[in-house]
Amino acid sequence: MSSRYVDTTAIMQVIGCVYNTPQLLDFTDKYTITDEDFPDEFHRIAFGAIYKIYELGAENITLENISDFLSSRPKSAASFKQNKGEEWLLKISDAAIPSAFDYYYNRLKKMTLLRAYDNYGVDVSYIYDPDNILDVKKKQAQEDWLDNATLEDIATKVDNTIEAIRMKF
């Protein structure tokens, strides 16, 4: 079951920036990127290849590195090829905005948290409802709140809602 809580732009920006500057992965105290941040297998493969190649000592990541790395992983290589991975990586690396990496990283992590709640059956549409296209004011208010909220703010809001339900019954 795919989740509604996916920000494809954030995913592309994060992968594009890390592809261009894999040294971002060195800041483990600031950035923690995991498989859970990528609900789509193709994105997990692309990011995973970049991550492993850098972890294995490459200072720069190239399409050739990725192709070589995936060549010993036929299933991943097939998915990467089917999704035109090389073309996609070139496109997102050109579109990557390094100065906005923190924004997109935080957006990625917020979607991961909302997706985790959603996957466990917790309705978080009162925080962010990506399916709302009719109530423009509500949509903007939710976007504004989400942009300004931390992961802790989101977790606290969900915890408070669950606690209110617990106290009611």
Q: Which residues does each predicted region cover?
A:
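Interdomain "pre-motor" coupling segment immediately N-terminal to P-loop NTPase/helicase cores
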Residues: S93-F169
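Noncatalytic partner-interaction/assembly domains of nucleic-acid and motor enzyme complexes
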Residues: M1-L113
